[in-house]
């Protein structure tokens, strides 16, 4: 019985550590430099910055009256 518990613990630790290695990288800062009047809403009222970023959006709560969670600029650079 102890061997099963030990193997289960090993499997859980391996799977847990591998999921940590694939962390969200976020957007380049320049992609979030959207003028306030051009922001396209990407969230919902009371969305947190973490929830917004996890959706692939930008978050800036410093300007009132415009969306805080908004779509980033389109990356026009080609990547190979």
Curated annotation (Swiss-Prot):
GO molecular function: identical protein binding
GO CC terms: extracellular space; secretory granule
Subcellular localization(s) per the UniProt record: Secreted, Extracellular space, Extracellular matrix; Cytoplasm
UniProt cross-references to Pfam families, sorted A to Z: Trefoil
Keyword line: Cytoplasm, Disulfide bond, Extracellular matrix, Secreted, Signal
S-S bridge residues: 32-58, 42-57, 52-69
InterPro entries: P_trefoil_chordata, P_trefoil_CS, P_trefoil_dom, P_trefoil_dom_sf
P-type domain mapped to chain residues: 30-73
Primary location class: secreted
UniProt KW Signal keyword: yes
SUPFAM superfamilies the record matches: Trefoil (SSF57492)
Leader peptide range in chain numbering: 1-23
SMART domains: PD (SM00018)
GO biological process, one term: maintenance of gastrointestinal epithelium
Organism domain of life: Eukaryota
Protein function: Involved in the maintenance and repair of the intestinal mucosa. Promotes the mobility of epithelial cells in healing processes (motogen).
Subunit details: Monomer. Homodimer; disulfide-linked.
Protein name in the entry: Trefoil factor 3
Gene name of the encoded protein: TFF3
């Amino acid at each position: 019985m102890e061997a099963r518990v030990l193997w289960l613990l090993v499997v859980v630790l391996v799977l847990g550590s591998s999921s940590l290695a694939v962390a969200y990288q976020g957007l380049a800062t320049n992609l979030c430099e959207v003028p306030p009047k051009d922001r396209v809403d990407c969230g919902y009222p009371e969305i947190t910055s973490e929830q917004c970023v996890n959706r692939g959006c930008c978050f800036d709560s410093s300007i009132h009256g415009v969306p805080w969670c908004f779509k980033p600029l389109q990356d026009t650079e080609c990547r190979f």
